[in-house]
């Protein structure tokens, strides 16, 4: 069982009330540029239930997003995967789930740069104006569409211009990715 706790910081927000537009338009930035130094191989490419770990994550993100967001006429999804050194091996997997792909040429600079690259790409290229962006890492094979749906729902239910939703899990409500 998972628990989603919504965090909202509106102290400096010009908006005092939640936006009344429903459904909200949510994009996804998938971080798949990790170097897997401790593991010694790319975790996202490991086998998982007949496919790869990355297939499981992409499937969960796609399923949870589809359950949460009303599709528009555009067939281009507001999804981007940010790759690193394994770009050529990861690209065919993520594109099969509707993700555009951009490569972080400097993955050693960390996730922050990959997030910035992904967010910039979505803001500049999304087929629809976005109200929020869900960021995920690509090595969580136990991620489910239901958890993704809960995170998006918590965001939608608590939306202000500076809403941040942090998923929590376990008895101690540890922060998740």
Give the ranges of each region predicted by the language model.
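Nucleotide and nucleotide-moiety/phosphate-recognizing core
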Residues: 18-174
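Conserved beta strand-loop-helix elements of the APE1-like EEP
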Residues: 177
